[in-house]
Amino acid sequence: MSKIFVDACFGKETPYTPVWMMRQAGRYLPEYMRVRAEAGNFLNLCHDPKKACEVTLQPVDIVGVDAAILFSDILVVPLEMGMDLKFVTGEGPKFDDPIKNEADLDRLFGGDEAASKLTYVYDTIKLIKEQLAEDKALIGFTGAPWTLATYMIEGEGTKTYNICKKMMYSNPKLLHKILSKVTEVVKFYMEKQIEAGIDVVQIFDSWAAAIEPSKYDEFSWKYMVEIADYLKAKYPHIPIIMFPKGIPAFLDKVYGNFEVFGVDWSTPMDLAKEKLGERYVLQGNMEPCRLYSKEETTESVESIQKIMGGKRHIFNLGHGILPDVPVENAKHFIKECHRVSKK
């Protein structure tokens, strides 16, 4: 059975424009909160294939999205490379011993050795595929090497990225070594996700906007493209979505062998279409806070549909759904995307 979502990724004609939401398996769903409470904490949930499978499937069953996205976290990659990851309540993820020099980097596992430790992710994928409806796609994902490296170097989330940027400008050789090592792990990681059964790959560069546009290709995009090239050579039937958040200034310079470009909410959809619409399918890009109002949601969905015309497009939010959004409003978003695009 063909999957509408996969067809849309390849720019094929579909009966309506498919839709999913970043962070769709998340805290706005009471059912998710129940499973997370049973798991004890977020990381336990990521490590438990049965529970991770359950929360992956929840938004498909409850909200009606056209694709499931694997429930996991981008930081399982540095965790299995050998870094000590903790999630601190109210503060987010922390690494106790961030990378300061080459010796710190050399201590970490690389390539297939690190990727082979992520068996709980691959087991989760296999469980999901057993239970996911045949017409629904499963999206696997990874953080981009730059986004992963920011946590590995800073030790936690940051607003300034000054430790990373100090390295970028004063010791770029070391930063490139870190990015290269992470890239090799991610290649094997995504390959193993594909072998386990995912239908689509998304690469999240959540902190793309931390890099000045003239340096973005050198320190992030080229590594994302390297991963895409590696996967495309082996798995041409698996579409790849690139999502660099918050860099409209880079639209003119986008290149690479992938199918879908994720547009965040700060980039006007008509601008993205003008710059990239002929080369790539576009995904996005409703402002997530519009979900607080059904009227605002309808207005945005209709506006995006008018720009895209139901062609070479996947509906999504321009970032993740927020925890206090009413479930009814999320359902309304999905229904409206289907309504306005039905052919």
Curated annotation (Swiss-Prot):
Superkingdom of origin organism: Bacteria
Keyword Nuclease carried by entry: no
EC class name: lyase
The keyword Lyase is annotated on this UniProt entry: yes
Site positions (Transition state stabilizer): D73
Gene it is expressed from: hemE
Subcellular location: Cytoplasm
Role, per record: Catalyzes the decarboxylation of four acetate groups of uroporphyrinogen-III to yield coproporphyrinogen-III.
PANTHER family hit by this protein: METHYLTETRAHYDROFOLATE:HOMOCYSTEINE METHYLTRANSFERASE RELATED, UROPORPHYRINOGEN DECARBOXYLASE
EC number from the UniProt entry: 4.1.1.37
Binding site residues for substrate: R23, Q24, A25, G26, R27, D73, Y151, S206, H319
Gene Ontology CC: one annotated term: cytosol
Pathway(s) served: Porphyrin-containing compound metabolism; protoporphyrin-IX biosynthesis; coproporphyrinogen-III from 5-aminolevulinate: step 4/4
Protein name: Uroporphyrinogen decarboxylase
